[in-house]
Amino acid sequence: MDARAPRPEARFAAGKAGYAGDMADQDFGSTDFGAQDSVADISAVDIADWRLRTFALYANVRKIAAEDPAEAHSYWRQERDRMFGTHPASPLTAAAKSSFGGLKTADYDPIYRFHIPLTNEGAGREMNVETGTDGLVRFVRLGTFDLPELGQLAVWKLNGYGGGIFVPFRDATAGQPGGSYGAGRYLLDTIKGAFHGVQGSGPEAEFVVDFNFAYNPSCAYNEAWACPLAGPSNRLAVEIPVGELY
């Protein structure tokens, strides 16, 4: 869930303090992700193609993961690297693409894959996020994921056109050397296709939650993007050393 072309005062622009707290400026190899290309030059057709490819990517991930989650993770890494490095709607600038060697992603660890129910804790709470492009973005809380030995994460629904389930998070690796992006990562963002499925139905339904597929918001790679980030209800005190790093 990323917005384009934020105004300078956008609360969630990379490098600024906002809802998620201070955002750390980190190096990503020799690539400078701070330089801004004009995102206004990205065509609507290219954006639509990026979205279609992302939905197809996660559909294939779910299919492969039903038999072999680690293989699905390898496929996910390969396809994301290809899209980031070559697609015209990639958040990487032209300069960053020229030296791009792949996203920094940890190897798969099955202990970070869960099948968990959505509890009612916190359900109905509203959260309004001021962005620089879409004005006030409204969320309503659907409930909570209780993650064994890790903590709790609020589960949000975009309360507007398109809907969608949204779960950002920030863990103890955020902003640390060799760790994750200082402002946090995304776990689920169904309006953009990032979803790993639900097993069962009704009260017995369980979400597939796999931190190995956690990924950085686009603003981690380009300051021209603004992104809703992890607030107090979406922070974990423990380290999550898997997924996309920074």
What are these regions (language model features)?
Residues 9-11, 19:
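Short, positively charged and aromatic/hydrophobic N-terminal segments
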Residues 21-162, 166-175, 186-191, 202, ...:
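A compositional/structural signature for long, glycine/proline-rich flexible linkers
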Residues 177-213:
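Acidic, glycine-rich flexible loop segments
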Residues 178-179, 219-223:
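Short conserved micro-motifs at the rims of enzyme active sites and ligand-binding pockets
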